[in-house]
Amino acid sequence: MAHKKSGGASRNGRDSNPKYLGVKRFEGQIVDAGNILVRQRGTKIYPGINVGLGRDFTLYALKPGIVKFSIKHGKKYVNVLPIQ
């Protein structure tokens, strides 16, 4: 009788935790200062008027207002326009 031990366990079976990236406040929504607008990896969207850029490229509102997205020179920007 052959005595061959069974093979090792599967090499798969790992997964990373979800990062919950993406746009969090959409165009036309009213935001307060400090609200997170976009979570991203790198600058897919750039900060515009009244928008700050965090250490992990998170875009957040610097002042209360209305969210507005725009494209300039092929780059996407997010702005927070003050409420009149």
Curated annotation (Swiss-Prot):
Region feature (Disordered): 1-20
Pfam families, sorted: Ribosomal_L27
Alphabetical UniProt keywords: Ribonucleoprotein, Ribosomal protein
Similarity section: Belongs to the bacterial ribosomal protein bL27 family.
Protein name in UniProt: Large ribosomal subunit protein bL27
GO biological process: translation
Signal sequence bounds: none
InterPro entries, per the entry: Ribosomal_bL27, Ribosomal_bL27_CS
NCBIfam families (alphabetical): L27
Organism field: Dictyoglomus thermophilum (strain ATCC 35947 / DSM 3960 / H-6-12)
GO cellular component: cytosolic large ribosomal subunit
GO molecular function: structural constituent of ribosome
Coiled coil, from the record: none
